[in-house]
Amino acid sequence: MENNDKENNNNNIEQPVKKNRSKKFFWIIFLSAILASAIYVVYNLYLRPDNFLRQIYLVPKDAIYIIETGDPVKNWHKFSESKPWQYLKEQRKMEEINQKAHKLDSVLQANKTLLDLLGRRNLIIAACMTRKSDYDFLFIVDIQKTSKLESLKSQLENLFKANNFRVTKRNFKGEQIQELYDPLDRSTLYLAIIENHLICSYTGLLVEKSIMEKDDPIIGRDLYFLDVEQKVPDGGLCKIYINYRNLDGYLTLFTGVPDPDIQNIYRPLAYTGLRFKVSDNMLSLKGYTSLNDFTENSYLPALLRSGSHPVTVQKVLSNRTAFYVDMGFDDPVKFINNVEDVLQKDKEAYDAFKKNWDLIEKKLKIDIRENFLSWMSGEVAFAQYTLGLLDRQNEFVAVIKMKNKKDAVKNLNIIEESIRKHTPVKFKTIEYEGYEIHFLEMKGFFRLLFGKMFDKLNKPYYTIIEDYAVFSNSTATLLSMIEDYRLGQTLEKDKDFNQFMKEFNNRSTVFAYTNMRKFFPLIRNFVSASSWQNLQEDQNFVLCFPQTGFQLTGEKEMFDTRWFGEFDVLPAAEESDDEETEAETVDFVDREDVLQDLELFYLEKFQGNVYTEFYDDGSVKSKSEMSKGVKDGKYQAFYPNGKLLIDGKFKNNQRTGIWKYFTENGKTFRKEKWKNGQLKK
């Protein structure tokens, strides 16, 4: 019995020991598995060698532009809450973009996991053409070490399935592409993980192009791109890169047909890289632009090699300036020599240049370098004004800074005298308030030296204001500019302009300035009626940027590039009735106009004492013969379409004789007899 009890006691003791050993064994196995998993994760994330790929290597070679940001979520929120975006997104022109932006914002807000995945990850968005009439975006996110997790793809798949996407998979060039179909809008998002990057697009072709690009990248190894990328300043919301090689098709989407003039501007450019910033009152882009090897028949490479010059023409430009372009270089003769060097790469262009150069010198018996370029300081500007006091033509001026005023006047007189001798031009120099106005018939001269923009100056008049020679096709334009300068109404004395100019370099190679609220009404003269109607419907989109400026400053092999847009919304205008009654159209004949001295001078010297009034669109409203500043002689008034409305006479500013009134069909609907300003019955 005792032996049996001892055996039972021993058995009871052995059972707990076995259970304890089993538990220990289980925990050893479990902890070992956890440790092994941890070691595996640590090894994958931190110890296994990184085979990271540069993000830019996945951007297709046909990318039009590239947007890069280091903190996409935070920067998107900052931009979407800014005053410029809050205003612009409500404009009709931004309707489609705003819908896409709203969808992006909704996705980010609704998907915490996606937000955590992106976080402070570097994001590239590349815009690429998908067909001749459309383009789309490719998104590339650098997920860094997260890409080493084997479960990442399945986690993403589960995430999208949880959001009611239908997920399918296919292989392309050894890489797996996940296709995420959204049954709500029937769109498909294509997604792949390539090395350390997550790439996706709503166009599968772009994901495929990205996969093919990684083995033979083009943009990421392009020296012109790398030069720009290295110099773009840090900070801001994002960096923007423009690939000019692929710009033709993209711009045609908006213009309908290729524009050779626009193409000639960007043809010599390779890439522009810019840092983008936004505040409540300013949008800014700052960076660099590189030129390519194909620089034939372009002034930009010549300008790059020719240095820069301080921007100073605002001293004499009227505060009516709507738009102006300023070119600057160290030395004008050196600039022209550089132009010739560039043009020699294109024999046809160079031969045409030399032919026109020789023709002008032979016809006028002058030496262009000696008689024109020698006295220039190195700054040339072309400007367009709003309509002035004297006429309703488009007012253009060219302004040239003089190095030596005395030498400039001497050589301009030589050119003027040569023109008188060798052409049938008859123009007597006139003087207004101490400023002489001269005439030079030099067709094609300014375009030859400074490019197509100056082609508008065929037969210019000129005057001297301070240290600047000012040229224009219109004497009225010059007289108005002289008067503005005399009255101190110049850009230099415009506080808003001066504040805006602080954003730019003091020296410049090319500088373009636009006062959009002055420039927009002038566009009407250059577009069709239907185009003008469309522009008017979208005018708030551009008028909210009252001042914009673009600047290129040559620095060795690249241009320092800057663009700034001032943001300021106009207050809502009160509605008014623009309809004009027949009586109102007729009544302006009785207005007592008091002409200013400038108008009287212009009438006497240039208009044969005929005073002309204009409608807002520039068409003639009335013509009055004048004597000593009052209506005296024939008077005619016209409908806006140019048809005759009134035919009569004035004597000493009073109606006299028979007055006839006509319908737009040319029929007389009323006759009146006047004497000494009194209507006879």
Feature locations, PLM:
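N-terminal Lys/Arg-rich, disordered targeting/topogenic segments
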Residues: 1-23
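Structural boundary/hinge residues at secondary-structure and domain interfaces
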Residues: 22-179, 226-269, 284, 288-395, ...
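An internal, short helix-loop-strand segment that often contains or flanks glycine-aspartate motifs
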Residues: 86-121, 159-282, 306-311, 350-366, ...
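Helix N-cap motif at beta-to-alpha junctions
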Residues: 143-148, 202-206, 402-406, 474-477
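Composition- and surface-driven signal marking solvent-exposed, interaction-prone regions
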Residues: 211-214, 288-290, 300-303, 338-340, ...
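Ordered core of a single globular domain
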Residues: 396-400
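C-terminal regions of mature proteins
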Residues: 544-575
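Glycine/tyrosine- and acidic-biased, solvent-exposed loop/turn segments at the edges of beta-strands
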Residues: 588-681
